[in-house]
Amino acid sequence: MERIPSAQPPPTCLPKAPGLEHGDLSGMDFAHMYQVYKSRRGIKRSEDSKETYKLPHRLIEKKRRDRINECIAQLKDLLPEHLKLTTLGHLEKAVVLELTLKHVKALTNLIDQQQQKIIALQSGLQAGDLSGRNLEAGQEMFCSGFQTCAREVLQYLAKHENTRDLKSSQLVTHLHRVVSELLQGGASRKPLDSAPKAVDLKEKPSFLAKGSEGPGKNCVPVIQRTFAPSGGEQSGSDTDTDSGYGGELEKGDLRSEQPYFKSDHGRRFAVGERVSTIKQESEEPPTKKSRMQLSEEEGHFAGSDLMGSPFLGPHPHQPPFCLPFYLIPPSATAYLPMLEKCWYPTSVPVLYPGLNTSAAALSSFMNPDKIPTPLLLPQRLPSPLAHSSLDSSALLQALKQIPPLNLETKD
């Protein structure tokens, strides 16, 4: 029968195998085995972790940059045009951010101001906050009220100008009524404004009718004239007489306290008589007719101002009347009587250069101390009635002896 060694106890003769003690295991070095195994797994794990970290980081950075660029583009679109025009060329990101910041600050200041105004309006205006504005507004209101009151007073006085028993209480009542109408809205204000205007329009046509009547009557002598007046007429009478604004006729009428059209009617009659007498003396009217002297009838209407003034004196608007040499040639002796009667009271004192034989004859007709120049009439002539009737035969003889005029004669 075979022996099973596992079932049998160990033989006692065999020596016991020495066991491994803890002290012996502690002295053994297993570092090389452990180090090789750990390094392989650590390297593999670190490489995988780095790859997995780099991929999300790049995506995150890209997304962040895309968001920044998108926001800057939107800000660029939202910026006002006047801010965009401040820079030239392409707007960079930094420029867009600066302009956005500037615009936001301006909007913030504006919102703050509006907020302050709203708070001030809600809480009521404090005393002294807007003192300057209140003062200006008060002055404007006072000026407008004063002008309105003055206009109403003037219109009321113009409306009741002919009323003698006008009282101040009536004016005050009228002003109170106007104030009440203004407070109600001024709907009934328009009839009050139109009433004084109607009164003024009624008064103006009457005044214009009087004014048109005056100039029309004063201009009657001018219309009836059949020949053009000369400069002597303007120097002899006031030019305002024909224009209807007064003159010597009106001065004389004010003294006598009579209507001017009465004296003007007499003047028309006198002028008509004078024109008819002139036409009877000469068949054809002279080319130039001037009132260089006044008859007794004309002097009655002209007044003392004209007679006191120098006869044919210098007029501020008219040069003195001159007679050139060539107007009266020696062969024109037939017209001398007409000249004597029409425009010169006495014999015609015409001097020619080189006049020897007629000097004595002419000196007898003229005053030695008032000898006129060859071209200018005397400044002061005596009245035609003061002179005796002088015969012009001597003057005619002297003029016949005058040789023909020389073209080189000097003035």
UniProtKB/Swiss-Prot annotation:
Stretches assigned to the Orange domain: 142-175
Domain bHLH, residue spans: 52-107
GO cellular component, one term: cytoplasm
Compositionally skewed regions (Basic and acidic residues) per UniProt: 248-271
Pfam annotation, one family: Hairy_orange
Function, in words: Transcriptional repressor involved in the regulation of the circadian rhythm by negatively regulating the activity of the clock genes and clock-controlled genes. Acts as the negative limb of a novel autoregulatory feedback loop (DEC loop) which differs from the one formed by the PER and CRY transcriptional repressors (PER/CRY loop). Both these loops are interlocked as it represses the expression of PER1/2 and in turn is repressed by PER1/2 and CRY1/2.
Induction section of the entry: Stimulated by retinoic acid (RA). Expressed in a circadian manner in the liver with a peak at ZT10.
Name of this protein: Class E basic helix-loop-helix protein 40
Modification Phosphoserine, positions: 235, 383
Essential for interaction with BMAL1, E-box binding and repressor activity against the CLOCK-BMAL1 heterodimer: annotated span: 1-139
